[in-house]
Amino acid sequence: MEKYNREEFEEVIVDIGRVTKVVKGGRRFRFTALVIVGNRKGLVGVGYGKAKEVPDAIRKAVDDAFKNIVEVKTKGSTIAHDVEVKYNASRILLKPASEGTGVIAGGSTRPIVELAGIKDILTKSLGSNNSANVVRATIKALTMLKG
């Protein structure tokens, strides 16, 4: 297992959710957090954490993200080729863009490609816009890239 210097990485919280368990005495709340970490130099990871308090869920998600770091192969400031990936009901399409285009991405796709260090890319999210599935589809697409 590789060890990364956490100071180099930035964290972005994509989603915080509240889940409820109804018990005899009322409702019990727990929180979930979806976090992306990246160093803007080709390393990016996604993590999911659950806890009774929001800060604990975020901390667990960050720890999980560092366990799931992947390397993204780039070609200059963009990606080498088109890639389309399906993850559950979410589909994501990534296309290389010419220099100066910028990151054209929406929702939870944008922080992933930015933290991966990609500066010029066109993306389209198709199907379900469930943030957890869109994030996982984007990570899957980035791992399929050939340098």
UniProtKB/Swiss-Prot annotation:
<comment type="function">
    <text>Located at the back of the 30S subunit body where it stabilizes the conformation of the head with respect to the body.</text>
</comment>
<dbReference type="Pfam" id="PF03719">
    <property type="entry name" value="Ribosomal_S5_C"/>
</dbReference>
<dbReference type="InterPro" id="IPR013810">
    <property type="entry name" value="Ribosomal_uS5_N"/>
</dbReference>
<comment type="function">
    <text>With S4 and S12 plays an important role in translational accuracy.</text>
</comment>
<dbReference type="GO" id="GO:0019843">
    <property type="term" value="F:rRNA binding"/>
</dbReference>
<protein>
    <recommendedName>
        <fullName>Small ribosomal subunit protein uS5</fullName>
    </recommendedName>
</protein>
<dbReference type="GO" id="GO:0015935">
    <property type="term" value="C:small ribosomal subunit"/>
</dbReference>
<keyword id="KW-0694">RNA-binding</keyword>
<dbReference type="InterPro" id="IPR005712">
    <property type="entry name" value="Ribosomal_uS5_bac-type"/>
</dbReference>
<dbReference type="InterPro" id="IPR000851">
    <property type="entry name" value="Ribosomal_uS5"/>
</dbReference>
<dbReference type="InterPro" id="IPR014721">
    <property type="entry name" value="Ribsml_uS5_D2-typ_fold_subgr"/>
</dbReference>
<comment type="similarity">
    <text>Belongs to the universal ribosomal protein uS5 family.</text>
</comment>
<keyword id="KW-0689">Ribosomal protein</keyword>
<comment type="subunit">
    <text>Part of the 30S ribosomal subunit. Contacts proteins S4 and S8.</text>
</comment>
<dbReference type="GO" id="GO:0006412">
    <property type="term" value="P:translation"/>
</dbReference>
<dbReference type="GO" id="GO:0003735">
    <property type="term" value="F:structural constituent of ribosome"/>
</dbReference>
<dbReference type="InterPro" id="IPR005324">
    <property type="entry name" value="Ribosomal_uS5_C"/>
</dbReference>
<dbReference type="InterPro" id="IPR020568">
    <property type="entry name" value="Ribosomal_Su5_D2-typ_SF"/>
</dbReference>
<dbReference type="InterPro" id="IPR018192">
    <property type="entry name" value="Ribosomal_uS5_N_CS"/>
</dbReference>
<keyword id="KW-0699">rRNA-binding</keyword>
<keyword id="KW-0687">Ribonucleoprotein</keyword>
<dbReference type="Pfam" id="PF00333">
    <property type="entry name" value="Ribosomal_S5"/>
</dbReference>
<feature type="domain" description="S5 DRBM">
    <location>
        <begin position="9"/>
        <end position="72"/>
    </location>
</feature>
